[in-house]
Swiss-Prot record:
Catalytic activity from the UniProt record: apo-[ACP] + CoA = holo-[ACP] + adenosine 3',5'-bisphosphate + H(+)
GO biological process: fatty acid biosynthetic process
EC number, UniProt record: 2.7.8.7
Gene3D superfamilies membership: 4'-phosphopantetheinyl transferase domain
Residues reported in the UniProt entry to bind Mg(2+): 8, 58
Keywords linked to the UniProt accession: Cytoplasm, Fatty acid biosynthesis, Fatty acid metabolism, Lipid biosynthesis, Lipid metabolism, Magnesium, Metal-binding, Transferase
Family, as annotated: Belongs to the P-Pant transferase superfamily. AcpS family.
Organism (species): Streptococcus thermophilus (strain ATCC BAA-491 / LMD-9)
Pfam families, sorted: ACPS
Protein name: Holo-[acyl-carrier-protein] synthase
């Protein structure tokens, strides 16, 4: 049974401006494992990754029904599976979490569906 669906759109250049103003911004959004991946990237790919994780976490919080605040950025971890697809590996939701992150030009869109387990 679907519990919630959330979508978010981020502008990569806006995320870059936030990062340029305060590089600690990335550490506020990313978990240690996500930070490791972020550090392994460079330039535009770094900002694209950060914007994608931000969008994914915002989309999760919307699907959860609270928005960011009741659930924090570090409460949600998005890593990649062995095929490179994003996977939510940590969240406060007890059930299935489906995520898709798409990049196009200066934009990143994320969609999250939360599915309750049947009992």
């Amino acid at each position: 049974m679907i519990f919630g669906h959330g979508i978010d759109l981020q502008e990569i250049s806006a995320v870059k401006k936030a990062y340029d103003r305060n590089p600690r911004f990335a550490k506020k959004v990313l978990t240690p494992k996500e930070w490791e991946r972020f550090e392994s990237l460079s330039g535009e790919r770094q900002m694209s990754f950060l914007a994608g994780r931000w969008a994914g976490k915002e989309a999760f919080s919307k699907a959860w029904g609270t928005g960011i605040g009741a659930v924090g950025f570090k409460d949600i971890e998005i890593l990649n599976n062995d095929k490179g697809a994003p996977v939510v590996t940590q969240s406060p939701f007890e059930g299935n979490v489906f995520i898709s992150i798409s990049h196009s030009g200066d934009f990143v869109q994320a969609s999250v569906i939360l599915e309750k387990n049947k009992r």
